[in-house]
Amino acid sequence: MAQKVTVTVLAKMKAEGEKITMLTAYDYPFARMVDECGVDMILVGDSLGMVVQGETSTLPVTMDQMVYHTTLVARAAKRAMVVGDMPFMSYQTSVKDAVINAGRFIKEAGAAAVKLEGGAAVADRIKAISQAGIPVQAHIGLTPQSVHQMGGFKVQRQEDRLLEDARIVQEAGAFSVVLEGIPFEIAEKITKTLSISTIGIGAGVHCDGQVLVIHDALGINEGHVPKFVKKYKQIAQIAREGITEYVDEVKSQAFPTKDHSFK
């Protein structure tokens, strides 16, 4: 069995210049495929609000929903590190709430780490969760939970603030940081400055690793996708063809045949 990915393994990968792969998953079948294909980290993202639940943002997602989906993913993952994404208002309210809710991901759902959005503003949460023995992945730049405050999903270009946020989350105890929606030159500077790994999403090739939403990467999401997404397959098209073929065969009585029937 391949070595389980841990914070120590990720630190070694950064030190040796080996790129880190991360994808989202929200259920057992996809998590199993992602894990068996060699992805290093599985993010159970609050993005499930948009790609699974049909919401227009991640804001409505609840802790109970995140714990449920993380449980399914953790059950499937044998090698990959499972990271539970802390949803809106699960950590913003207080340090105590942050630690309690982070603990639910580990104790109830079986995750190995949690992710939360924000830089300096959540440093006390990162520190407290880390001191409770829970690995924390930070997330700076474009932070979807702050979409209203940012005025939409916009590229973040404030270099000094981004560099400062990155430094502060590292000092607070984060083992990694997601860099979302920032110019690649800034992401490169952050990656060279930090000793912890940077995982990019719309942040260029110089990050220590990359993450994508699986529904975007596999073409399951048929709506608008950001510029930074590459669709590696067109699963929605294949699924539609199969569903249409099924409907046609049932209507025409081509299915089921004797091969699919019992005597």
UniProtKB/Swiss-Prot annotation:
It is found in: Cytoplasm. Keywords: Cytoplasm, Magnesium, Metal-binding, Pantothenate biosynthesis, Transferase. InterPro entries: Pantoate_hydroxy_MeTrfase, Pyrv/PenolPyrv_kinase-like_dom, Pyrv_kinase-like_dom_sf. One of its GO terms (cellular component) is cytoplasm. 3-methyl-2-oxobutanoate binds at residues 46-47, 85, 115. Its EC number is 2.1.2.11. GO terms for molecular function: 3-methyl-2-oxobutanoate hydroxymethyltransferase activity; magnesium ion binding. Its cofactor is Mg(2+). Pathway: Cofactor biosynthesis; (R)-pantothenate biosynthesis; (R)-pantoate from 3-methyl-2-oxobutanoate: step 1/2. HAMAP family: PanB (MF_00156). Catalyzes the reversible reaction in which hydroxymethyl group from 5,10-methylenetetrahydrofolate is transferred onto alpha-ketoisovalerate to form ketopantoate. Belongs to the PanB family. Homodecamer; pentamer of dimers. This is 3-methyl-2-oxobutanoate hydroxymethyltransferase. It comes from Desulfatibacillum aliphaticivorans. The gene is panB.
